[in-house]
Amino acid sequence: MEDAQESGECLVQNQKYCVERPIYNQEILQGQLHKRERTPQSLRQKIEHSCRCSSKKAKSHLYSFLPILKWLPRYPVKEYLLGDIISGISTGVMQLPQGLAYALLAAVPPVFGLYSSFYPVFLYTFFGTSKHISIGTFAVISMMVGGVAVRQVPDEVISVGYNSTNATDASDYYSLRDDKRVQVAVTLAFLSGIIQLCLGFLRFGFVAIYLTEPLVRGFTTAAAVHVFTSQLKYLLGVKTSRYSGPLSVVYSLVAVFSKITTTNIAALIVGLTCIALLLIGKEINLRFKKKLPVPIPMEIIVVIIGTGVSAGMNLTESYGVDVVGKIPQGLSAPAVPEIQLIPAIFIDAVAIAIVGFSMAVSMAKIFALKHGYTIDGNQELIALGICNSVGSFFQSFPITCSMSRSLVQESTGGKTQIAGALSSIMVLLVIVAIGYLFEPLPQTVLAAIVMVNLKGMFKQFADVAHFWRTSKIELAIWVVAFVASLFLGLDYGLLTAVAFAMITVIYRTQRPQYRILGQIPDTDIYCDVEEYEEVKEYPGIKIFQANTSLYFANSESYTSALKKKTGVDPCAILAARRKAQKKHAREIKKANKVKKKAVLKLVNSSTNDVEASVKHEIANDGLPANGKFAFVDAGVQDGSPDELEHFVEPKTNVHSLILDFAPVNFVDSVGAKTLKSVIKEYNEVGVCVCIASCSGPVMNELTRLNFFDNTVTRELLFHSIHDAVLACQGKDRSASQTALDH
């Protein structure tokens, strides 16, 4: 620390920044520079270049599409294999209970959660670029899927024709309802995967930037409330319908509390016990993270205990506790998704595709930054698209990255995608061999697992205080995303949040910060005069800066702020001058009338001596001898047009205005017209307008928009603020000297 301080002191004391050069405006600078010759490619040439394929290019594309071909041959077995095995087993142990639990969120039978924890996870090993994220079921995506499934296949529709209390009829009812909801979930996976593939191949990975961190955190916090609410009925063991769409949270809470008296005490005790065990286990893992070789797999422990207790005490028959039920052994045959459902679920699929990608790529970037490698956002889109679309043929619902499993996979020593492949193989063993053992598992245990896993998301409520301190606009985005997603549903809430986030971008460009800059003495550095005491303005020169681009949405506010900040309003000055000139003209006219009346009156007097005396007095003093008329100044007596023309009061003490264009990234046609109008208006009142630090792309845009002409030339554009200041000072001195000479 001391060395750094000494180095800083040496830098201040010993190093100088001395530059002596001419003052550069763009006209002079461009005259001294020689542009490189650039021949733009035609569309045909671009197509030919993109279609040309050499062996090197083909190999590069193949490695890009299948990253496993690049890293697997170089896999250091001795260094990485043990860590990947431990990590794969630890993650697989979490995949199993979470797959079963999140299937309930997706409104499908639990076995489909296992399918979704196997096929996509295994496929990601070949196509993904992140070494540490754990692909599979995730609460938010599962909740979105469940909302669509319930909307498309509500209980009321299926219940028609099943009014019998016969057990066989009830079984058929649930079977038919679940089959239809599975079709919706599978088709969602297929469609969202196709959308992700299209975005990936079209290199549209940047769409994730529109889901900003405050938006995603507000959205996921609302999703956590949705998920928690949906699990209350399983925890309490009450029978209620599942709701989707606007106000579904309210309806769900009303339905649960209206049947609170029918709570299954056995289910509640089992659920609360599991919640307590899971919270204790997570706290132990957190406190002793450095001492434990691997985290304690409390979720699978709770599942095993819950299954054993349920089977041993026969909770279903004795206490009416709902259990997972039938888990088919083995993999199901491939099936084509229901294509006819696509029009009804397309918007939902777009939302799921983008949210899923955003979750995965944000988590992947965190681990990539931590471990020093890069990920390809477009390839991640392709990988997720393949996982979802191919997995849909094997009855898996949409998946993405799970934050909790990814943290476990990374913290337990996972080095590559091999860990993910091993976790999927563990799920496969359960599907083909021992899945039936989990049939007695109480649903309240799965609800407990889901609820405890929401702990991290509920901690995001602390974001409100954080964003209140740092950024009110980001706080507004968080609140809108949360409230809209909570009450309008996750689909409409997400659309509302994205729309609001876009509006805030427009708002920020419409309401930027405007500053008047001044010089730090004896430097070429210019800062805000209101922020620093040492900063001084040059007499007669105003330097105006707006930290935004100039376009149609803010051009009016730009000119308003310019007039307000500089204190120079050309329209007001011209209006004041016209008013003063009119008043001056009226005074001259009135004085001429008085003069004429006085002369006529004196001409009619009877005494020639008096007449001569009066004429003499008028010629010398401009007043009648009797003194009945007010004195008229000699300058006002002469109402000649020449004197009126040279009357330019009131004046402004500003002779030059410099617009700092360093923050300006682009200018559109409206902005260019506004800028040109500003220059001409200020010129009319004798204020010279210059533009400083204009970037090359903005210069090119101004040229394309025909901004420059005989009155607005490139001589008004300067390389830096200091160039413009020196030029304005020199011009003012020349003008003052010329005025003195005349």
UniProtKB/Swiss-Prot annotation:
Which regions does the annotation call intramembrane?
248-259
- Membrane topology reported for the UniProt record: Multi-pass membrane protein
Q: Where are the transmembrane segments?
A: 77-106, 110-127, 139-152, 169-202, 213-236, 265-288, 298-313, 339-373, 377-394, 403-412, 417-438, 443-470, 472-487, 490-510
CDD domains (alphabetical): STAS_SulP_like_sulfate_transporter
Q: Which residues form the STAS domain?
A: 531-728
Site (Controls the anion transport): which residue positions? 404
Which residues are listed for salicylate binding in this entry? 404
Record's comment describing the protein's domains? The anion-binding site in STAS domain is lacking. The STAS domain mediates dimerization, with both STAS domains latched onto each other in a domain-swapped manner. The N-terminus domain is involved in dimerization such that each N-terminus domain embraces both STAS domains. The transmembrane domain consists of 14 transmembrane segments organized in a 7(+)7 inverted repeat architecture that can be divided into two main helix bundles, the ''core'' domain and the ''gate'' domain. The transmembrane regions are domain-swapped with the STAS domain containing N- and C-terminal cytoplasmic domains.
Annotated function = Electrogenic antiporter that exchanges sulfate or oxalate for chloride ion in a strictly coupled manner with a 1:1 stoichiometry. Adopts a dynamic conformation, which alternates between the exposure of the central binding site to the extra- and intracellular solutions leading to an inward-to-outward conformational transition during the transport cycle.
Q: What is this protein called?
A: Prestin
Species annotation: Gallus gallus (Chicken)
Its lineage reads:
Eukaryota, Metazoa, Chordata, Craniata, Vertebrata
Name of the coding gene: SLC26A5
